[in-house]
From Swiss-Prot:
Keywords linked to the UniProt accession: Glycoprotein, Membrane, Transmembrane, Transmembrane helix
Topology class, membrane: Multi-pass membrane protein
Name of the protein described by the UniProt record: Uncharacterized protein R513
Native source organism of the sequence: Acanthamoeba polyphaga mimivirus
GO CC annotations on file: membrane
Keyword Glycoprotein part of the UniProt annotation: yes
Localization terms from the record: Membrane
Keyword Glycoprotein: yes
Transmembrane regions: 36-56, 86-106, 115-135, 143-163
Residues carrying sugar: N74, N164
Length: 168
């Protein structure tokens, strides 16, 4: 069994990423982070909406909850499925918001902050929370096809990851 050695350069690099800088440095990172073009904002919204559609449609495809909704909304079995769907989407959406914020913090000082990816994740989480609330209080369902939602999510995420937003 070999021991894992942590080099000083690895720990100092991690400490440098996690440690906040001065107020002026962080203010500069923050102002660079929110300077997006209109087409970049479209990609962010695309990531968010297609992500929520993919999560909701995957859940619907696995459980068949849409068939039950068409039949009757007040059956106890349907009510349990909708409550489970609400809990799953709200948890995943909260994780997306937290993950997007953490990722934005970790990438804040880099030359390419992956703004489209982190803002898309955070916005997707926020829209997911709103979608979960509509399920909880109005019993709505999503009609977008499962395959289209996952393909569009993948396309927007890849677009957000690979597009250089630093203006170079």
């Amino acid at each position: 069994m070999s021991d894992v050695t942590v080099t000083p350069s690895a720990t100092s690099k991690l400490t440098g990423i996690l440690k906040p800088g001065s107020y002026e440095i962080e203010k500069g990172h923050f102002s660079r982070y929110f300077s997006l073009n209109w087409w970049q904002l479209i990609v962010v919204v695309g990531i968010a909406i297609s992500g929520i559609a993919a999560i909701a449609n995957t859940y619907d495809a696995i459980t068949g909850v849409d068939k039950d909704i068409e039949g009757c909304e007040n059956v106890s079995n349907l009510r349990k499925k909708l409550e489970a769907k609400f809990i799953i989407i709200i948890v995943l959406s909260c994780l997306a918001v937290v993950g997007g914020i953490i990722l934005a913090w970790l990438l804040r000082s880099g030359t390419n902050q992956r703004k489209l990816l982190t803002m898309g994740l955070t916005t997707g989480g926020i829209l997911g929370i709103l979608y979960a609330l509509t399920i909880r209080f109005r019993g709505t369902s999503n009609m977008v096809k499962l395959g289209i939602s996952w393909v569009s999510l993948l396309a927007f995420v890849l677009l957000g990851f690979f597009i250089n937003t630093s203006g170079e």
